[in-house]
């Protein structure tokens, strides 16, 4: 193999690498004396040493080589760092490119600026140790491992000129999310999408153990990657000069392969799934760091993972650190003012070609609004509340179909789901766009195409990761999922919510489209699949996050769902959670009333309520709880003809919090107008009851709020038996009201006996007939 790098260029690139390594070590260790123009003293070293060295030199090596490729070929490229604990390396490179100073002018390119750069790293109220949102060029923090490759593919979708270089740590490669992410290449269309270059970095060790992929044979690893559909290229060694040449040549080769794949697809109509290139880079963990500390090997071992030299009460350690840092020869890298020398600065790309300044890594800079149809045009027409039944998500599907249709030209919207689009009644979208599929297509297959925009794969991890990558690079999306199984990505949601929370404090981070979840096939209609499919707890999980990030909606019918979905698709920098059923349910509000209701978030349903001061407030949130509440209202009017009832429906769950706690929260006056200050409130809730108590505990009438919801009772049974098992049924709600209205004390015993007799009749009937009682099955509202 002929050398790609001239000797002069090799020396300069090695110097640039040394500069990045020097700045990385400085961030971990130093608070003063950044250029080592004095002998290193103990007071130059931070009192608390935090950070991770082991992965960093490998990340820095790749960065300088990708910069050469960008400059040589004028590439549009971003860099995703799976081992995000190598944060000092990415900060160092953003600083060397000048982007860091542009974003943070106080961190100037000078001796003082370098000192501030060092001091702020992992310092109280400084910058985090990972590739956090504060890091220019980052769309992936990499704190929680496993999501880098899914983010990379999400970024590449519909970005035909973008190359996403994605470093996969060999420890990260052991996670389930990463293992399935290799299959993303079956969903990447080279005719219209960008390219992902996975770079598996085998440095051999995790925190305290070897990595699996570093300890299998080269042939096994080759077979594994080829089995995933990649063509692996190996770069190995511990001699910098040799590795520089090998890596440069390999990058040239894989770029040529990427361009050939894209040319065949774009100019010659080749629709076969290509074998994309990837790189396996095997270099020592903690390369260029100390070989040994206290007689124990460090470089190339797990001991290099975090801070290789830690105890500076030992004077030999101070000497060891100084020798390590001086081995990078900082006087050759920076001038006397602390600025990177001009001949090295010339190696870096400029402007938006810098990976740290690429607008795809600050997706809000590229974000264009969706072309949304008027959701009113898709409304269910009602002659009155409860006049007909409809499948709410099927109605939504017609709206999303035309959202998709309107975005076909702009190519900035995709629908994501784990093999559930049709099951969740959203299959109208398939009328305008099939499902993306680059693998083999057989005669029995329907709605599969290399040109699809509906992304279905049976991995919630991939759906979430793809969508996050798509959103973070300036596009829009929608994720539908069975309610119980969205828990699979609980932790991924956590990380995205944290990312958005941090971004809100960073002025240069432009707002991105919200992450929109539709949870359906929900707990109350999973009677056919049973206990394993019954869990509404994601609502609680989302509610734990910062109020400036999360929104939770429980539309009671199809028209409310349309209004909520339109609102969510227009929003920015939120995680919107929508929970709505897919089964035929009674419809309550015409579209104008639905818009008003969703705008206020909660309100009295006057058509179901009595005028004046109520005896009881019957509150509800969720489609099935709404039906049960209204059925309970009818029962109460039969049982107690002179009863005064107020029906309050909540569609925006966060209005229950005080306005001091959430921007959507009702002020105390408005809350009291709805729920009274002293009357019993029977609250039928879609999820776990204690969440309502958490949200309302500061309210004046909280002591009188009695909540029914899911209490972890379930099985394969009838739809109505599901609510019975959890005391959410209409008969229980009616009894709860009678038991809590003081003037009805003399009716309590009779009401209780009637309730248990009804429950016995219900149990016997479903046991004999396998279906619900006719009065339940055939119930409907009438004023």
UniProtKB/Swiss-Prot annotation:
GO terms for molecular function: aldehyde-lyase activity. Belongs to the XFP family. InterPro entries: Phosphoketolase, THDP-binding, Transketo_C/PFOR_II, Xul5P/Fru6P_PKetolase, Xul5P/Fru6P_PKetolase_C, Xul5P/Fru6P_PKetolase_CS, Xul5P/Fru6P_PKetolase_N, Xul5P/Fru6P_PKetolase_ThDP_BS. Its EC number is 4.1.2.-. This is Probable phosphoketolase. Its cofactor is thiamine diphosphate. It comes from the Bacteria. PROSITE patterns: PHOSPHOKETOLASE_1 (PS60002), PHOSPHOKETOLASE_2 (PS60003). Pfam families: XFP, XFP_C, XFP_N. Keywords: Lyase, Thiamine pyrophosphate. Signal peptide: none annotated. GO terms for biological process: carbohydrate metabolic process.
């Amino acid at each position: 193999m002929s050398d790609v790098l001239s000797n002069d260029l090799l020396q300069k690139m090695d110097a640039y690498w040394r500069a990045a390594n020097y700045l990385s070590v400085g961030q971990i260790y130093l608070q003063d004396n950044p250029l080592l123009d004095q002998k290193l003293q103990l007071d130059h070293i931070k009192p608390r040493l935090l950070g991770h060295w082991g992965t960093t030199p490998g990340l820095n090596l790749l960065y300088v080589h990708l910069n050469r490729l960008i400059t040589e070929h004028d590439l549009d490229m971003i860099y995703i760092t799976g081992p995000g604990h190598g944060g000092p390396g990415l900060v160092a490179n953003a600083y060397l490119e000048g982007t860091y100073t542009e974003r943070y002018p106080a961190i100037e390119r000078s001796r003082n600026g370098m000192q501030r750069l060092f001091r702020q790293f992992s310092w109280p109220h400084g910058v985090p140790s990972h590739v956090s949102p504060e890091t220019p060029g980052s769309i992936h923090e990499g704190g929680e491992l496993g999501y880098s490759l899914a983010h990379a593919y999400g970024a590449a979708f519909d970005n035909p000129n973008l190359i996403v270089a994605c470093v996969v740590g060999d420890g990260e490669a052991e996670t389930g999310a990463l293992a399935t992410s290799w299959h993303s290449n079956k969903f990447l269309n080279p005719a219209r999408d960008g390219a992902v270059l996975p770079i598996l970095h085998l440095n051999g060790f995790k925190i305290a153990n070897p990595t699996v992929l570093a300890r299998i044979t080269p042939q096994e690893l080759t077979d594994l990657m080829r089995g995933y559909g990649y063509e692996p290229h190996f770069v190995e060694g511990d001699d910098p000069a040799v590795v520089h040449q090998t890596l440069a040549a390999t990058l040239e080769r894989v770029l040529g392969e990427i361009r050939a794949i894209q040319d065949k697809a774009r100019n010659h109509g080749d629709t076969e799934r290509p074998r994309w290139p990837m790189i396996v880079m095997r270099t020592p963990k903690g390369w260029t760091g100390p070989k040994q500390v206290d007689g124990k090997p460090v470089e190339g071992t797990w001991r290099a993972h975090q801070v290789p030299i830690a105890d500076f009460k030992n004077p030999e350690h101070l000497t060891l650190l100084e020798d390590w840092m001086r081995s990078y020869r900082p006087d050759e890298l920076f001038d006397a003012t602390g600025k990177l020398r001009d001949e090295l600065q010339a190696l870096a790309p400029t402007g938006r070609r810098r990976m740290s300044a690429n607008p795809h890594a600050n997706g809000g800079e590229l974000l264009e609004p969706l072309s949304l149809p008027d959701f009113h045009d898709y409304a269910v027409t009602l002659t009155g509340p409860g006049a007909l039944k409809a499948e709410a998500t099927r109605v939504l599907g017609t709206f999303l179909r035309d959202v998709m249709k309107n975005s076909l030209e702009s190519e900035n919207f995709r629908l994501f789901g784990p093999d559930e689009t049709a099951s969740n009644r959203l299959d109208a979208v398939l009328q305008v766009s099939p499902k993306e599929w680059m693998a083999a297509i057989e005669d029995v297959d329907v709605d599969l195409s290399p040109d699809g925009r509906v992304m279905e794969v049976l991995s919630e991890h991939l759906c979430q990761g793809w969508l996050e990558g798509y959103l973070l690079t300036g596009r829009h999306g929608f994720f539908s999922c069975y309610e119980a199984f969205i828990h699979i990505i609980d932790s991924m949601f956590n990380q995205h919510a944290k990312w958005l929370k941090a971004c809100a404090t960073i002025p240069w981070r432009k707002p991105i489209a919200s992450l929109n979840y539709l949870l359906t096939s929900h707990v109350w209609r999973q009677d056919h699949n049973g206990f394993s499919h019954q869990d509404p707890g994601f609502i609680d999980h989302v509610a734990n996050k910062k109020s400036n990030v999360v929104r939770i909606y429980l539309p009671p019918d199809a028209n409310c769902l349309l209004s909520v979905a339109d609102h969510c698709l227009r929003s920015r920098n939120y995680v919107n959670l929508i929970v709505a059923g897919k089964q035929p349910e009674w419809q309550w509000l015409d579209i104008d009333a639905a818009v008003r209701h969703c705008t206020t978030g909660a309100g009295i349903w006057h058509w179901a309520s009595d005028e004046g001061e109520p005896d009881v407030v019957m509150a509800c949130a969720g489609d099935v709880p709404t039906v049960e509440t209204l059925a309970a209202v009818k029962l109460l009017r039969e049982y107690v003809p002179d009863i005064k009832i107020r029906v309050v429906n909540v569609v925006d769950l966060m209005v229950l919090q005080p306005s001091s706690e959430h921007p959507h929260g009702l002020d105390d006056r408005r809350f009291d107008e709805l729920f009274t200050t002293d009357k019993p409130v029977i609250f039928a809730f879609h999820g776990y009851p204690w969440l309502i108590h958490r949200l309302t505990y500061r309210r004046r009438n909280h002591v009188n709020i009695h909540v029914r919801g899911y209490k972890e009772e379930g099985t394969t049974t009838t739809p109505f038996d599901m609510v019975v098992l959890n005391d959410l049924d209409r008969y229980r709600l009616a009894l709860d009201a009678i038991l809590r209205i003081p003037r009805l004390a003399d009716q309590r015993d009779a009401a209780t006996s009637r309730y248990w007799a009804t429950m016995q009749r219900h149990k016997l009937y479903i046991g004999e007939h396998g279906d619900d009682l006719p009065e339940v099955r055939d119930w409907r509202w009438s004023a």
